[in-house]
């Protein structure tokens, strides 16, 4: 049975503006029409690790994310079935015991750094977009976000950037732009995806 659900995948480097782009795109539709899903909700639970080991974990590698669950959730949403989405706590690097009920919508926007690097996940998208922005701007944005929202110091952010973020970007994220239907140079130059195009 063919689904009427339209799924858009939006990827790009950390700090590239993909979340802002996804949010702005969602505003083109009513709350009854559109659903926004973030890759970040699908980080694997590290509760079994010590606090120090969690901090050393490579969160920028695809293996740190439960893409199998994300794919299952997208499949269920296309069938009109509500899902129980994990709630991830970035301060403790673990999933909360509670979940978030997500109802199916006609348009689903999925955003995340690595979503275009997963071949099985690509099959779920009707349209794919890659947000491209210079490295320094991405880093500056990440520093500001992680300090204000995730309780980290600038030194911690810079160490993580040099040891995992940048290497994983070069290995997985940057090559995934070849899977994009549209490559957008920064969120300021957002593409105009009209409702008629997404129907």
PLM region spans:
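NTP-dependent small-molecule kinase module
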Residues: 2, 103-104, 144, 166-199
């Amino acid at each position: 049975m063919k689904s009427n659900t339209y799924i858009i995948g939006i990827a790009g480097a950390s700090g590239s503006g993909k979340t802002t782009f996804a949010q702005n795109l969602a505003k083109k539709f009513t709350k009854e029409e559109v659903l926004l899903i973030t890759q970040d909700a699908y980080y694997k639970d590290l509760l079994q690790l010590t606090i120090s080991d969690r901090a050393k974990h490579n969160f920028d590698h695809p293996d740190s994310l439960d893409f199998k669950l994300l794919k299952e959730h997208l499949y269920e949403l296309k069938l009109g079935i509500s899902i129980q989405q994990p709630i991830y706590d970035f301060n403790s690097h673990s999933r909360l015991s509670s979940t978030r009920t997500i109802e199916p919508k006609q348009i689903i926007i999925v955003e995340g750094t690595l979503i275009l690097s997963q071949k099985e996940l690509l099959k779920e998208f009707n349209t794919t977009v890659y947000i491209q922005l210079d490295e320094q701007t991405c880093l500056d944005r990440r520093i500001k976000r992680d300090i204000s929202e995730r309780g980290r110091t600038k030194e911690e952010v810079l160490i993580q950037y040099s040891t995992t973020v940048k290497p994983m970007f070069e290995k997985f994220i940057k090559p995934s732009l070849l899977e994009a239907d549209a490559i957008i140079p920064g969120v300021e130059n957002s593409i105009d995806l009209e409702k008629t195009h997404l129907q």
